Amino acid sequence: MQTLRQQQPIVPSSPGHDPFLIVENVSKIYETPKGPYTVLDGVNLTVQEGEFICVIGHSGCGKSTLLNMVSGFNQPSHGSVRLKGKEIDRPGPDRMVVFQNYALLPWMTAYENVYLAVDCVNPQMREGEKREIVREHLAMVGLTEAAEKKITQISGGMKQRVAIARALSIRPEVLILDEPFGALDAITKEELQEELLKIWNDHRCTVLMITHDIDEALFLADRLVMMTNGPAANIGEIMTIPFPRPRDRERIMEDPQYYDLRNYALDFLYNRFAHDDE
C-alpha cells in the first residue's frame, strides 16, 4: 500500500508553480489558565486542484482546527496556509463550508437559504440569473419539489442537501465538509455520498472532508489524511486510495485491496494511535 509520511518535503505540482493548496509547518497554540496548549504541531499538507481529500482521526486531534484555518475562520500560530499562492487570513467565497448541523436559517425556505448566499456574493448579478443559479443547484441535489418548504418542514437528509446546494451555488474553489453526514441514518448517508461524488465529478472543485467513517473515506477520497492524537497532533500518514473513478460501491467492496486499506486505517487509529481510554 502506498502511504506518505507526514514530514515529506512540499513538492510543487509543476516547475515554478505551487500546488493549489499548501499547509506549511502549521502549528496552533491556545493560551489557557494552565499555560499554552498546542493543538497542532508542524503540520504539512499539499493538495492539488480538484482533489478529494478526507481527514480522519480521533476526537480532539485537531481535524476541525486544521480545516478552520483553511476556511479562514482561524489563523495558525506558526506557519502558513496558502491557496493559489495567496495567504489565507480570513473567510472568503472561494471557500465554502458545510457543517454537520446544517447551519441553515430555519424561518426561510430551502430556496431562500440558497438565494441568500448567491445574492450576498453576487449583489450586482441580474435577478433572473440569481434565480436560475438557485433553481439549478436545488435541482442538482434533488430538491426542486421541496424548494418552497421551510427548513423546519424537511428531513435531516434534505437539510444537508440544501446546505450542499447553498455552498456550491457560489461556485467555490474549495468545498470544506465537516462531518456532513455524521448525523444521518445509514441509508440516507449512502445516498448523499453517491450524490456528493456525482456533484463533485461535475463541478471538480477541491474537497476537504472530515469524517470518522473509514468506509466513507475509502469510497469518496483520492487520499486519506490520518491524524495522530492530540495534543500537539500531526499528520501521521497519508494513504493514497487507488480505486478508479467513477466509483461503484459494490465493485470497490468486492476488491481485496479495499479490506487491506480498511484494516490498515483501523490499525492506525485503534492500535498505533489508540486513545488512552481505549
Curated annotation (Swiss-Prot):
Coiled coil: none annotated. Induction: By carbon dioxide-limited conditions, probably via CmpR. ATP binds at residues 57-64. The keyword DNA-binding does not apply. Residues 21-254 form the ABC transporter domain. GO terms for cellular component: plasma membrane. One of its GO terms (biological process) is monoatomic ion transport. It is an enzyme of class 7 (translocase). Part of the ABC transporter complex CmpABCD involved in bicarbonate transport. Responsible for energy coupling to the transport system. PANTHER family: NITRATE ABC TRANSPORTER ATP-BINDING PROTEIN, TAURINE IMPORT ATP-BINDING PROTEIN-RELATED. This is Bicarbonate transport ATP-binding protein CmpD. It comes from Synechococcus elongatus (strain ATCC 33912 / PCC 7942 / FACHB-805). The lineage of its organism: Bacteria, Bacillati, Cyanobacteriota, Cyanophyceae, Synechococcales.
